[in-house]
Amino acid sequence: MEYHIIKKGIDSVLADNLLFKLKLFLADLAFEYPFFTEWLEKVFKELTLTDSRLIILSCDNGIFDIKGVSILKKTSDEKKICTLRVVKSSRNQGIGSCLLQKSVELLEENKPLITVSGIHMKEF
């Protein structure tokens, strides 16, 4: 499994392609969170402009074969895991744990905030 950190300075063509892939990968979240797609687009705009957004991708066969993702917000006021998702077929293989560990390291916070949909509270 490969892990890629996407941050400020990403090539705009690569960012557009990753946004497209993540919209597909996270499509079901649009049913759980109002305006999720618009939020994801905003994250990518912020990603190209500031250091406050980071994305960690877990990939199998190259950067576009996404198996898991963690979307982070890191500001002086907030260190937060906004989204953490592993594709169902790749769950229970340690990918989520690895994404969580890498998120904690990048956020430099042992107890970051994390957004969890009410539907998924029992999983945590």
Feature map (PLM): residue ranges:
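GNAT/GCN5-related N-acetyltransferase fold signature
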Residues: 57-58, 70-74, 86
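Conserved GNAT acetyl-CoA-binding A-motif
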Residues: 107-119
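A short helix-loop-beta-strand connector motif used in the catalytic cores of GNAT acetyltransferases and
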Residues: 43-59, 80
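Conserved acetyl-CoA-binding loop-helix of GNAT-fold acetyltransferases
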Residues: 86, 92-106
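Glycine-rich phosphate/pyrophosphate-binding loop shared by adenosine-nucleotide-utilizing enzymes
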Residues: 62-69, 79
